[in-house]
Every structure is written in C-alpha cells, then in structure tokens.
C-alpha cells in the first residue's frame, strides 16, 4: 500500500472503531467504513483481516449470519496459506466453525477445524484451543470416540511444552466424555491420573483450586451415575469446600488468574457458573438420597443465582443449568404430593427449552419433559396419558438410564392397568439388558422393587419378599432412603397379607419414619392404611383411629391438589406427545379429572437422577 492508501486505511479503521464504540453504536456506518477498505485493493493480509473484522461485527451486532459467513469464508480462504498470520488465521477458523454450528452445519465446521489444527502445531495456544473446539463439536454430535481421541492428542501435545495445567484440563475433559460413554474403568483411571497431577504437579494455587472443582464435580457425577449416594459424600464435601475457597471475597478475579501465560488462558467455567454447578450436583445428591427438603432449598438458591447471572449476561449454559434444576425440583414436587406446582414447573421448563437458540434445549431435553409429564400423569392416575408420555420419552432418547427409568415407570403403569403381557415384556427386556451391561445401583434396586410389586399383585408373597430384600440390600448399602421407604412399606403390606402382624409392624414403622423425613406423601398414605389395619387386628382402637385420620388427611391433600391442578391450562400438556409443545395453552380444552377414588395406595414411583451436569461444556 502507498503512504496515502495507508493513511486512508488507518482513518477508515479509526472511523469504524469510533462508530462501533459510540453510544449507541452505529453499526451500519462501522460496516460501511470497513467495506470501503476493499476499494483500495489492499494486500492479502489486510483484506483477510478486514473480512474477519466484518464477520465479527456482523455476528456480534446483527442477525445477518449469511453475510457474516460470507466474510468469514473469504477471510479463511485468504489467510489459510499465509505464514506468520496466526491470530487472524485461527481466529477466523474458530469463528467460522462456531457460525457453522449455529446454523446446524457441523459437517462444515469439522474440516475447517481439522485443517486449522494441522496448521497450528507450532502455536500451543491455538493448537489446544482448536482441539478443544473440535472435540466439543464431535461431542455435541454424540461422536464421543472422536472427541476422546482429540482430547488424547491434546494430552500428548502438552507433554512437549510441559504445560501441566493444560494437560490436566485435557485429562479431565476426556474423563467427562468417557463418563457419557459409560466407560467406568477408564473414567477412574483418568481421574486418578488427573488427581495425582493436581496434587503434585500444578504449582499455581489458584489454578490448582479451579482444577480441584472440575475434578470433584466429575468424581461426584461419576458416583451418582453409579447410584453410589453414600460413597460420594466425601467427594461432595471436598467439592463444597473448594467452591467456598474460590467464592471467598479475597479470591482474585478470573481475569487475573487465567492470563499469566498462553497455556494458562483456558478455563472450563467461570467461578460464578461453577458456584451454580456445585449447587446442581448437591441437589442431584439430595434427590437420590431422598432429602426432598434439602433438594428444594438448594434448587431455590441455585435458581436465584442463575437469575442474578442472567441479568448480567445471559449465557446459554445458564439455561442448561436451569432446565436440569427444574427437572429435579419437579420430581421433588411429585414425591411430596404437590402436583399443582409440578405441572406449572413442567410448563416453565418447556418455555425455557423453547426460548433457547434454534430450540437447542428442546432437542436435548424433550425426552426428559415427556418423562416428567409421564410421572405427573401417572401420579394423577391418567394412565393412558402416562403410557404415551413414557413411550415418547423412550423414543426420543438414547440415554440408557433415562430409557430404563421410563421403562420401570411404564411397568408400574401396566401393573396398575392390569396389562400383564406388556408388563412381562418390559421386565424381560430390562433383565436381558442388565445382563449385558452395568447399571446404576439406584436403578437396579428400583428394578427389583418393581418385580417385588408385581409379585405382590399376583399374591406371590414369597417371591415378593425375595425381590424386596434384594432392593433393601442395595438401598441400605448406599443410603437410598426413598427406595428403602418404598421397599419397607411394600414388604409390610406383604407381611400383612400373610397375617404376620409383628413383621408387618416392624417394616411399616421405619418406613413411615423415613417417609416423614423425606417427605413422601405416597408412602405415608400407603403406610397409614397399613397401620390402620394392623391396629384393628391388634385391637388398638385409639391407634387405629389415629392412623385412619392420618390416612384421610394424606388422601384429602392429594385429592384437593389433583382437583386444583386439573383446572390449570398447563394440565393439557399431558396430551403433547410429538413435535414442539403447544404455545399458549389457555384456549385449549381442559381435560376432566378422573374420579377421586382412582388415587390408590400403591402409587409410589421411582426417582430418576437427571442427566449429568456439565456434559454440555468442555471449553468455554
């Protein structure tokens, strides 16, 4: 460029920046200034950089993604083969790949990222950033083996530069992918390797603490995935201690910590989001352990924190956290007999999913929404609706635990509908699948419970006792309180049915104690009915009257709540089984409530551990 062209170029750049930073920004004039640069036929480097700048501006300030894409594609084509032009070249590749993904064209993003990775081997920062991004792209497309391979390449590439922090980040990210793949043995091996590095090799105390949080989140999720609620307690306490350290007032800002060197600029999640995530895994643990009050308390705190963060900057990951928290709190409401709140929150979860970019969350969570609607319909004795919702869930998901959970609840629906052939098919299918792969201890305990419930309904009392003792053994080993209370109350009913009042009382008493602690209104309803019969058999009229009054109170509360929720427009969501959920629902006909007499004692359902948090984020 001549000196006069140089001056024009600098002036136009200055003007563009002036218009961009004006209050309010004048993006149209900013873009016009940048486009005017092309009239001077600038050198390739200047042309490529200008196309990148236009792409950045268009993506950040406008909805004209097609024009942004055009500029970024030109920037990539021009810069791809220019030496000593790393920032423009790799920034372009990264941004273009992001845009392709936004347009749901990850097949175009992958070759761009692969080429950029190949060209960036001399630049540790960009090489690692692009490896993370491509791994994330494959993980989003559920190509977990490819994502894992790329993260393994990242581990190897950091060996050459002795970047210990970055190596640990790659290891933990790979462990996360393997958790999704259910490679239990490999997860433990990698977590142990990463844990040793965090303790002995990472010198920076601030980076060490962030890695600890990442490590403990994965460890806690791993144990919860296996249904090991008791085993996880130590790791959960350590996680809570680490997050308290990071959130302390004297802890430096993220910007001060992640910027000391190129290999330390990578962050899994900022501390405010980690804070929400720790609440989330604590809620998950409380749910599985059967502490609904605790789960509710932590959910409310987490949702408050999410709203606070949204008011500052509405990051997509916050909606992911919100939807998983809502999934948990909805199950709490159903266990506690509060269907009217549950259906309102299901509708809220649906709205959160619909409001996400390109309905991304709806695609990820439609199966969970159907499952929650199935549980809601089941608890309200709308069994045909529950059946359709569980089928929709099973057809929508590839997640093994969610399929198993939906099938177990579907089995209870068939049991209540006296459809023995379909029930037998489900139980045989679950049995066959369980022989081929390991499942969550909580879910397998639930499977034995459903078999025990089935045997009880067939009056096969000896077989029912055998299944329920197996359930109790698994539940007691890991402090699965809700599973324990459900099993004890059913076992009590078994003993009552064979006339063994002493053993029946020995079972129902701890069942009621646990149920009031959870609290689980369905077990309390069932247990109070058993106690009424037991006290009548034992000729204890005062205690019989007390048990009868308790039973009436539980029953009336459930009936009143059901009458209330069936009048809500949100109740019609139980008819949604395919496509996008309806919006709005106010004009839709409200389904009539079934007779109150259909609320039966054996309405206990199984509680699901929701999809594990953090799986959607490898690098941000």
From Swiss-Prot:
TPR repeats lie at residues 90-123, 445-478, 485-518. Its main location: nucleus. Keywords: Cell cycle, Cell division, Chromosome partition, Mitosis, Nucleus, Repeat, TPR repeat. It is found in: Nucleus, Nucleoplasm. Disulfide bonds: none annotated. One of its GO terms (cellular component) is SMC loading complex. GO terms for biological process: cell division; chromosome segregation; maintenance of mitotic sister chromatid cohesion. InterPro entries: MAU2, TPR-like_helical_dom_sf. Component of the cohesin loading complex. Required for association of the cohesin complex with chromatin during interphase. Plays a role in sister chromatid cohesion and normal progression through prometaphase. Belongs to the SCC4/mau-2 family. This is MAU2 chromatid cohesion factor homolog. It comes from Aedes aegypti.
